[in-house]
UniProtKB/Swiss-Prot annotation:
Gene expressing this chain: PIP5KL1
Primary location group: cytoplasm
GO molecular function, one term: 1-phosphatidylinositol-4-phosphate 5-kinase activity
Name of the protein this chain belongs to: Phosphatidylinositol 4-phosphate 5-kinase-like protein 1
Signal peptide: none
Residues annotated as domain PIPK: 36-393
Annotated GO CC locations: cell projection; cytosol; plasma membrane
Coiled-coil positions: none
Length: 394
């Protein structure tokens, strides 16, 4: 692979002004037209004066420069062991941005058909990030790229270490099951301002993209303790991600795609169980199909070649649990039922069932007798989420 040598390295970063695309007047107009819609979706532009504006500007400049490295040194094959351990630190004016396992993620992005130029344009300077106000109890910050295609989340050091330790097996799982429902992790980075403490963050594809017509969003863990969110007041611009108890009385009507969904959930949760991971979520969003989008032939004609690309035979396609993908952006996370389009993806893959979580399990067992909660063994967690999916689909 024509890439920098493995191990920690520190280099001066190029400036995004040297090569990033200019924001054209038509693009500015598009951004302005999106602002009203974004406010109605509960997304808030991180503009000058926002407390996170400085941080996100550094992230944008740093990600532009980091992506330029992978564009200058594109991967020529699957990642090596050294690629998974490489750490590149680029020095900018006033901050440093670290890129962890950069060549491995560059290869993964390429395998997903994601052009580095598009990735750089979406995450770099050119449009402010959007703040997403999460109902999560964690202290993480959540952002969306200005086009809402990519999701950024701050992570703790322990979680980042777990993600990187599991990265080779994660890549292998996606190779074996190209239509996996696991969220596509696209980058892991660190940001350090004026030689201070590092802030780690990840970049992933947004499960809820494109979001324009989505009516409901849910974060499902398959349990009941702390799994209720008070809905937003009528007329509020804030669109909340609701939880398990809010989902009562609802179903996911997938029709003939239900069997594929159940099988893929089994494959993905088995993989996470083998990693000793728990506390992940199934994200679900509803979008009502237009009349011309309904019916078995509405989007099948143009999608067959893309869906079977890479499979050598029908037997291999079945072993990989491939399906016909919709002719839509973000097709890996979209399943169409008879009446609704569903956005589905498994996220938050970094919590390991170590000593801390075992002690938390014991405490919650005493605190919530007879009730279900998230901190259980990975085997029980995987089984329970699959049971929830089976009970709430038709």
């Amino acid at each position: 692979m024509a890439a920098p040598s493995p191990g920690p390295r520190e280099v001066l970063a190029p400036s995004p002004e040297a090569g990033c695309r200019a924001v054209t007047s038509s693009r500015r107009g598009l951004l302005w037209r999106l602002r009203d819609k974004q406010s109605r979706l509960g997304l808030f532009e991180i503009s000058p004066g926002h407390e996170l504006h400085g941080m996100t500007c550094m992230m944008q400049a740093g990600l532009w420069a980091a992506t330029q490295v992978s564009m200058d040194h594109p991967p020529t094959g699957p990642p090596s062991r050294d690629d998974f351990s490489e750490v590149l630190t680029q020095v900018h004016e006033g901050f440093e941005l670290g890129t962890l396992a950069g060549p491995a993620f560059a290869w993964l992005r390429r395998s997903l058909g994601l052009a580095e130029e598009d990735y750089q344009a979406a995450l770099g300077p050119g449009g402010p990030y959007l703040q997403f106000l999460s109902t999560s109890k964690s202290k993480a910050s959540f952002f969306l790229s200005h086009d809402q295609r990519f999701f950024l989340k701050t992570q703790g050091r322990r979680e980042v270490q777990a993600l990187l330790a599991h990265l080779p097996r994660y890549v292998q799982h996606l190779q074996r099951h190209p239509h996996s429902l696991l969220a596509r992790l696209l980058g892991v980075h660190s940001l350090r301002v004026d030689r201070g403490k590092k802030t780690y963050f990840i970049v992933m594809q947004s499960v809820f993209y494109p979001a324009g017509r989505i009516s409901e969003r849910y974060d499902i863990k398959g349990c009941e303790v702390s799994r209720w969110v008070d809905p937003a007041p009528e007329g509020s611009p804030l669109v909340l991600v609701l939880k398990d108890l809010n989902f009562q009385g609802k179903t996911i009507n997938l029709g003939p795609q239900r069997s594929w969904f159940l099988r893929q959930m089994e494959l993905d949760t088995t993989f996470l169980r083998e990693l000793n991971v728990l506390d992940y979520s199934l994200l679900i969003a509803f979008q009502r199909l237009h009349e011309d989008e309904r019916g078995p032939g509405s989007s099948l004609i143009f999608r067959t070649a893309r869906s079977v690309q890479g499979a050598q035979s029908p037997e291999e396609s079945r072993a990989q649990n491939r399906r016909l993908l919709p002719d839509a952006p973000n097709a890996l996370h979209i399943l169409d039922g008879p009446e609704q389009r569903y956005f589905l993806g498994v996220v938050d893959l970094a919590t390991v069932y170590g000593l801390r979580k075992r002690l938390e399990h014991l405490w919650k067992t005493l605190r919530y007798p007879g009730r279900t909660f998230s901190t259980v063994s990975p085997a029980r967690y995987a089984r329970r989420l699959c049971q929830w999916v089976e009970a709430h689909t038709e």
